[in-house]
Design a protein with these regions (language model features):
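Thiamine diphosphate
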Residues: 38, 90-101, 105-109, 218-296
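Gly-rich Lys/Arg/Thr-decorated short loops/hinges at beta-loop-alpha junctions or inter-strand turns
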Residues: 1-13, 73-75, 173-183, 230-231, ...
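Short internal beta-strands
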Residues: 60-67, 126-129, 288-291
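Conserved thiamine diphosphate
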Residues: 97, 152, 304-345
């Protein structure tokens, strides 16, 4: 049948209006604060320049949720890294000392804040979010602004005073020394963290990083040097296993001049493994880095830690030959466990154009640490 007319294009809804008074109130709170923290969520994605300008002008230590990683470079002196369940240990303690939270585009989810009533108990809250339903849903803000983050910052930044906040930065540094977050086996490309570091050494910041969902996702969030907005594509909220490879394909189609690296686990990869055919048919420069622990790692970890070793339906009794599967789809393959020089082999296959599977075996007993147990406060972390 024939369609005579195309449906009308969707129109972008007008950004919500907000009051000048709320901006003045927010600025006054920031200027008066002694221990403020900037708390970024995925809703800041379209405001990277102004977010950084605010942080640097007011010298705000800045923490990010999983969805906001890269908004400040990993090594930026104001970056506290990720907060929450698998966040930076010192960051969870630093937040408890805050007297003001400036929350931009974040929703106070339980993975980020842990036990609600014990999260930042002494901090006033400024909350900016375009979704009215998020304002006051979990934590009651002292100033709530429903608006686009970039629009708010355009008016807020001129009213914010430049301050050194030397005492606060000294306390932050002291807590970071007291509660370090070590990265074990950081130089071993056959270990979880070492593999992530080795992959990062093969590319520059133009590379796009996608992940599936599981332990590999958390390890990558902790260790990969994410240094720019939109470098990082991952599934928060619903935590969709199988997200990584299709996301990598989309990123490669939209950015044919960039390397695209997809970190995945064996459980997640099998959710959408047929999309290897799409990557192969289009000869997309997508490299799948498969951390294969023959288990559903996060499920295995939760059961091992909190259910008296009662691991159930979390391991694969039969071995799956991902190398043969990938080759059958037409991908290049590399098993780093069989390479005399894993780093050199990794560099070589990443440098080659086209899709490839890079396979590394990971011990199923490896854990993502630190970890905030379910229902606990962020300061009740377990693990190394």
């Amino acid at each position: 049948f024939e369609i005579e007319t195309q449906p009308a294009m969707a129109e972008k809804a007008a950004a919500p209006a907000f009051s000048e008074e709320s901006i003045r109130d927010a600025a006054a709170m920031i200027n008066a604060a002694k221990r403020p923290v900037l708390y970024l969520g995925g809703g800041v994605i379209n405001a990277p320049a102004r977010v950084r300008e605010l942080a640097e002008k007011a010298q705000l230590p800045t923490t990010m949720t999983l969805m906001a990683l890269g908004m400040l470079p990993k090594a930026h002196p104001l970056s506290l890294g990720m907060l929450g369940m698998h966040g930076v240990r010192s960051t969870n303690y630093i937040l408890q000392e805050a007297d003001l939270l400036i929350v931009l585009g974040a929703r106070f989810d339980d993975r980020a804040i842990g036990k609600t009533e014990q999260f930042c108990p002494n901090a006033k809250i400024i909350h900016v979010d375009i979704d009215r339903a998020e304002l006051g849903k979990i934590k009651q803000p002292h100033v709530a602004i429903q608006a686009d983050v970039d629009d708010v910052l355009a008016q807020l930044i001129p009213l914010v005073e430049a301050q050194p906040r030397a005492e606060w930065h000294q306390l932050v540094a002291d807590l970071q020394r007291e509660f370090p977050c070590p990265i074990p086996k950081a130089c071993d490309p056959l270990s979880h963290y070492g593999l992530i570091n080795a992959v990062a050494a093969c590319v520059d910041d133009n590379a796009i990083i996608t992940t599936d969902v599981g332990q590999h996702q958390m390890w990558t969030a902790q260790a990969y040097p994410l240094n720019r907005p939109r470098q990082w594509l991952t599934s928060g909220g619903l935590g969709t296993m199988g997200f990584g490879l299709p996301a990598a394909i989309g990123a490669a189609l939209a950015n044919p001049d960039r390397k695209v690296l997809c970190f995945s686990g064996d459980g997640s990869l099998m959710m959408n493994i047929q999309e290897m055919a799409t990557a192969s048919e289009n000869q997309l420069d997508v490299k799948i880095i498969l951390m294969n622990n023959e288990a559903l790692g996060l499920v295995h970890q939760q059961q091992s830690l909190f259910y008296k070793q009662g691991v159930f339906a979390a391991t694969y009794p039969g071995k799956i030959n991902f190398m043969q599967i990938a080759a059958g789809f037409g991908l290049e393959t590399c098993d780093l466990n069989n390479e005399a020089d894993p780093q050199a082999a990794l560099q070589e296959i990443i440098n080659r154009p086209g899709p490839a599977l890079i396979h590394v075996r990971i011990d199923a007993e490896e854990k993502v640490y630190p970890m905030v147990p379910p229902g606990a406060a962020n300061t009740e972390m377990v693990g190394e």
